[in-house]
Every structure is written in C-alpha cells, then in structure tokens.
C-alpha cells in the first residue's frame, strides 16, 4: 500500500501546487517492504542520504503481512526507525479533539469529557522503546516463554521531548 498511497498524495500535492502557484519536485526511492523486495534491506544508505538532502520526505505505509516473518533487524519498520534517527525526527505530535456533538460516540465518561476536549499528545519517537532490546526467552520460573521490552531513556531524550511539548 505504500507506493499507492504516496502516488495519491503526490496528486493531492500537485493540485495544491496548482491552486497556490507552487511546483513540487519528486524523487522516488524505496524504503520499508518495497526496499526489502528490491534490495534485501528495509533502508539503503542511498535512500538515507537522499532524504537528508531533501526539503521533505513523503512516506507511505511501512509494511504488511508479506514481511511478517523477516528477522527483526530486517523488518519494514526498521526503515522508519532508521529515517527518524538519521533525520533527527524525535517528536510525534498527535492532536485529538472531541466535540460535544460527538460525545455519545466517545468511550470516555461524559463527566470526564464535559463539553469536549482539545489536547495534543507529544510522544518521543527515537528513544529506547523503539531501539531498546526486546524479544522472547524462556522464563526462569517455569512460566514458559516470556516477552521482554527494555526501555531506557537518557536525560537528554527526556528533556528534548519535554521541551518540544512545552514549546507548542
């Protein structure tokens, strides 16, 4: 779905450009599942360098069931993580609004949402929850296989995301 989404997004951008007198120039490179198929890896150094020198990057869907059995270091989402790290993209900014007219559709209790809400969630994208050690191992207490996901964040990473959130 990645290339198909990007193709449609480019059509939309071109229409916006027509309306506002702007021309977009596109250079297409493979990443994620498409890159695994073509290059054997989710992200090539060439793609990283091209993205570093671009004004912006338009990325479609990351993967799909076709790549579910890839080793963890070669899964499609590794491209997304690699691009985030290479481009210094550390903040995921997610606005959320609930209008009073839609309150009945919200799973949050009415006494909590009141007349609705307008919040922004600022989430860290390059720290250890994404890059930390995770996997499966045999438990030491006969519980069978257990999963683990270690998360460690530096003071710098915590301060950086907090600063970004408070600057909004």
Which residues make up each language-model segment?
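Anion-binding alpha/beta catalytic cores of soluble intermediary-metabolism enzymes, centered on
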Residues: 1-4, 18, 23-25, 30-168
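A short, Lys/Arg-enriched amphipathic alpha-helix followed by its capping loop at the start of a domain
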Residues: 9-20
